[in-house]
Amino acid sequence: MIAILGLAAAAPSAQGQGYNPFQIGASGGIAFPTGDLGTGTNTGYNIAVVVGYKPQLLPISVRAEAAYNQFGRTGGGSSVNIPSFTGNVVYELPLGMSFTPYAIGGAGLYRPSVGFNSGGATSAENDFGWNIGGGIKIPLSTSFETFVEARYNSVSVSGPNGGTASFIPVTVGILF
């Protein structure tokens, strides 16, 4: 009896063998300025590093991201730079298909600034921001997946100009 209990406790489930709930990845894509930010800036780009935790058999996971967005100013001479550090919750919609749609949303620290090509002074302040969006995840193996997503980001900008900086990055990424 003790031997049977020992074997039962030592034998991992076939479904759980080799599963690692921790993920790391990267993404990049195009970023569209909207609202106040869309006035006077051009379409830009987004790059990000992702660290996540995805419990097995649950449709909810968490993702921490360090991202960088840059938008050129119309007329040249400067750019708007928005690095961010956010925590996000991902909810997968398990539909039993070869891809999985998901909703994502979170909040964190954004640091918008304007950089001048002539080397002029820049100003940057830490501001609160949030994001919400969705995507499609495509598993390529048990430990490797790719995704395509779009998220609306809104940053409450402090300082003399104030207002809200909003943008929508459309990205492609990989997770290991």
PLM features per residue range, with description:
Residues 1-20:
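Cleavable N-terminal export/targeting peptides
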Residues 14-21, 52, 90, 135:
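Secretion/assembly modules of Gram-negative surface proteins
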Residues 18-32, 103:
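Transmembrane beta-strand segments of Gram-negative outer membrane beta-barrel proteins
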Residues 20, 117-122:
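Solvent-exposed loop segments that connect transmembrane elements
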Residues 30-48, 125-126:
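Surface-exposed strand-loop-strand hairpins of Gram-negative outer-membrane beta-barrel proteins
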Residues 35-42, 74-79, 157-165:
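Solvent-exposed loop/turn segments connecting transmembrane beta-strands
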Residues 47-118, 127-130, 138-140, 144-146, ...:
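Gram-negative (and chloroplast) outer-membrane scaffold detector with strong preference
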